[in-house]
Amino acid sequence: MVLAGVAQRPWIKSCDRAFYGSMALSAATTEAPEQTGFWALTLGGIGVVFGDIGTSPLYAFREAVAGAAGGAPASRVLVLGVLSLILWALLIVVTAKYVLLLLRADNNGEGGTLSLMALGRRALGRRSLFLLVLGVIGASMFIGDSMITPAISVLSAIEGLKIAAPALEHYVVPLTVLVLVLLFGVQSHGTAIVARFFGPVMLVWFATLAAMGAMHIMDDPSVLAAINPWYAAQFLASHGTIGLVTLGAVFLAVTGGEALYADLGHFGRRPIQTAWLGFVLPALLINYFGQGALVLSNPAALENPFYKMVPEALVLPLTLMATAATVIASQAVITGAFSLISQAVQLGLLPRFEVRYTSETNAGQIYLPRVNALLLIGVLLLVLLFQTSSRLASAYGIAVSTTMVVDGIMGFVVIWKLWRWSWPAAALVILPLVLVDAMFFSANLLKLLDGAWVPLLFGLAMAVVIWTWRRGVALLMIKSRRAEVPLDDLIGSLEKHPPHIVKGTAVFLTADAEFVPPALLHNLKHNKVLHEHNVILTIETMHTPRVEAADRIRLVKVSEKFSKVALRFGFMETPNVPKALVLARKLGWEFDIMSTSFFVSRRSLKPAAQSEMWRWQTKLFVALAKSANDATDYFQIPTGRVVEVGAQVTI
């Protein structure tokens, strides 16, 4: 196993930044409406941002009412109570918290849990371990959700076959597996071509939801009484533990709401707000109330109220449309997982994964083969283990509710410290929202033994990997520092006793520019030569999504033969070292790739007999290091210009 020292990211000077933003489908900022076209972004937002929450009507109302009824016929009070809970959950959690409040908390135009964390840590003016832990928890839970969302979404859509043709019930799981395998299989080819249809398809989907609901509200117009929050309060007060369990099912209606904030940087605040308030929210509410009216007029429809809303002849076309919508929702989650992992790698929280670019024009469209394979395995295991969307619904929600609680807590820090509100005013605004999130989180915990342990297990595994990697890298740096030589001392020694000088430029990638890179020491020791120009290169990942070209590079001339160069990248950028070094020409260094050699230090790790980490953790760290992709590829350095110097290290 070989480990590149520069790739381990201990040299990242500002670890107080976010590593999980939103899906890297575009690079629009909050000013994008003026640049790209407001309505085009609004349509794009409908296709990407609302895919997850837009497919919730397939199962959310059914699961909530069925769970509350406990096998008995659903009473009017029960149906109205559930509808009222869904309505006010959408208004409080999604509309008030995310659409009206957190969409204003952007990090240079970007949103998402980790961007919020970066804002909070910046506002505190110090490295806050508490906020970092919250960010890791939020990111870890997203990975768990990334496996459940495709499974439950596609499975619930294809279950429409049981309504259209009961004889096909046995084909639901195999067809679900087939669709998911195809979905993950095409990821390597990119989604640029089909992505342009996401907006129009979801536009038709939401219009269909509204039309279906509007037709059935007339079955029992009294269902509109559920707009009164009294029905929600009465339901919770009179149903005790059952009410709390039902709340966990009601939460299914708001899963995906966090995507509104996560995708802020892609579509802008105004397009997302317009799409939600003007189209998506009304369509969802009309459909939910239509399902409620249908169940009140025909209790037998509770078996699957969504598909019972259309004539039998239209069930199959609706199933196909629902499948398309769930595939789009799943695609958005998969892309988000790729983006999350890529940013975690960029910030040194995970080893380098192989990244393939699927678009020649948009660097944000990426494909991670290993991550894709792991997600597919996890999704298929969930489908085969749970078999139905009703069973899988028990596992859904805990990850999202955890993320929402995290967002609320960090939102308080931003409002208080960054927006400079008084803490009582900030608490007055955010505390009620956090309490609602906490209530949903508690409700989902009740489903722990029924399947909620699954995303928690996935999230825990992700958190352990991040913790192990950070701890291992830190210990590796401490061990390396003991043998390091100050750069100034070496330069002074070389000036007194100069070695043989060869033509050209040598760039040494290193963790800390104050000390001599191991590759430079090896070059002097074994080759006994020094280049005409020697550049000590460090790479910094900032706590902003992107770095302007003017701030990309810093160059300091140390001596006649030595310079220090620091390259800065945002946590959502893909580092391209040769391209960035071209900017050095403006600072006086005529960078020429053909006369430059890049020296990369690489370490081969072995578990030590005694380590500061647990034995299992040491083995995990070494395994993670072995799996790391090559630093040369990651920094996009031409392989013909790279010299690798290795050493074996025990940890």
From Swiss-Prot:
Gene Ontology cellular-component terms listed: plasma membrane
Keywords: Cell inner membrane, Cell membrane, Ion transport, Membrane, Potassium, Potassium transport, Symport, Transmembrane, Transmembrane helix, Transport
UniProt-annotated location(s): Cell inner membrane
Transmembrane segments: 38-58, 77-97, 129-149, 166-186, 197-217, 242-262, 276-296, 314-334, 366-386, 396-416, 421-441, 448-468
One term of GO molecular function: potassium ion transmembrane transporter activity
UniProt-listed Pfam families: K_trans, K_trans_C
Membrane topology: Multi-pass membrane protein
Family named by the database record: Belongs to the HAK/KUP transporter (TC 2.A.72) family.
PANTHER family referenced in this protein's UniProt entry, alphabetically: LOW AFFINITY POTASSIUM TRANSPORT SYSTEM PROTEIN KUP, OSMOTIC STRESS POTASSIUM TRANSPORTER
Main function: Transport of potassium into the cell. Likely operates as a K(+):H(+) symporter.
Name listed for the protein in its UniProt record: Probable potassium transport system protein Kup 3
Source organism of this protein record: Rhodopseudomonas palustris (strain ATCC BAA-98 / CGA009)
Organism taxonomic ancestry: Bacteria, Pseudomonadati, Pseudomonadota, Alphaproteobacteria, Hyphomicrobiales
